[in-house]
Amino acid sequence: MNILKDLEERLILKDISNKDKFANLSPSTTGVYVGFDPTAESLHLGNYILISVLLRFKEYGFKTYAVLGGATGMIGDPSFKDSERVLLDNESVNKNKSKIKAQLESFGLEVIDNYDFYKDMNVLEFLRNVGKLVNVSYMMAKESVQKRIQKGLSFTEFTYQLLQGFDFLKTYQELGVKVQLGGSDQWGNIVTGIDMISKVVGDKHEAVGVTVNLLSDENGKKIGKSTGGGALWIDKNMCSPFKMYQYLLSQKDSRIKELLYWFSFKSVSEINEVLEKHFANPSTQEAQRFLASEVVENIFGANELKQAKNITKILFDKSFDASVLTLNDLEIIENYLPTCPIRQGDSVIETLIKNKFIVSNREAREFIQAKALKIDNKEIEFDSIYSPSLFEGKYAFFKKGKKQVILFKTV
């Protein structure tokens, strides 16, 4: 099997610019890259989709590179964004670069900073050497540009595709990168790079663009920094492994096949066996547990997965006796759960509203009527006073509904 066949079977391949050219490429002499702009302190689960696909290319013998957007991150990609990005200052970009570089290297990827492509190039050289390669009418015709042009598109963002295109040309010439991989929203920028290569190298070039489907929520909206991915960072200090585990565990059966195909490094046949067992008895959530376990371990490591599983058992296994937990256990759990400070004798509902865990008195009454607010598995009333009886009175578990768990910490 080849990599394209694998991606097709996994239902993640979106587009490829030229299948014939790709078929003639030799993995051992072909580089593949994905670009990651340092527009935040961490990558998120949506980015991890591309990391995982890049690692699949690596498994098939390709040379793989992650191009860190030290230059492009200072400009901002306008592709399918509703409004102008807020430009980051140099200090923020450099801070983000350092953290994201470490994340990418933790997956065994070679990281290249595209700032090095431009740092010694002045504006006149850029206009002569890069701008000359692309026609303005061609740039204007891009769907990503057309969607923004009526709402306002700065020249800065308009030129982003020139930078990404030149990245492809530069890596093609210097590193033997013949394949640029990206999410489906990057198609226009990738094709710009191929056109640049064609003008410089000629029609017999070997450059190919490959795009894959974007990770979206159940409503079909892309999961990114500003659309939900911000809650799913792959930095455990920004998103706990427990939270990531719970997110994946909560995925609906209607999406689980797609997510397993995309995220899991098991073969399609092995995944199908898991799905068959799961749908024979969906209440076991076998497929969701398989997905959550593999992704959390791949991103955060085996120890963090073990901790996430243990906390899940503590919080959601009705047969588990929480009273056996020690204060040391609670101090660890505090790193994984939303924590609400509260004093002995304080009103529970007032404290929850103040800390925005409950929206209003009305919402509180609705949950109380449904018997869906509990402290240490005991139902509370609207006028309940905080008086914990477990863990030496220093902690208590608060549950809102079936899934939201908060740790009360006595202050």
Curated annotation (Swiss-Prot):
ATP binds at residue 225. One of its GO terms (cellular component) is cytosol. One of its GO terms (biological process) is tyrosyl-tRNA aminoacylation. Gene3D superfamilies: HUPs (3.40.50.620), RNA-binding S4 domain (3.10.290.10), Tyrosyl-Transfer RNA Synthetase (1.10.240.10). Residues 347-411 form the S4 RNA-binding domain. PROSITE patterns: AA_TRNA_LIGASE_I (PS00178). Homodimer. This is Tyrosine--tRNA ligase.
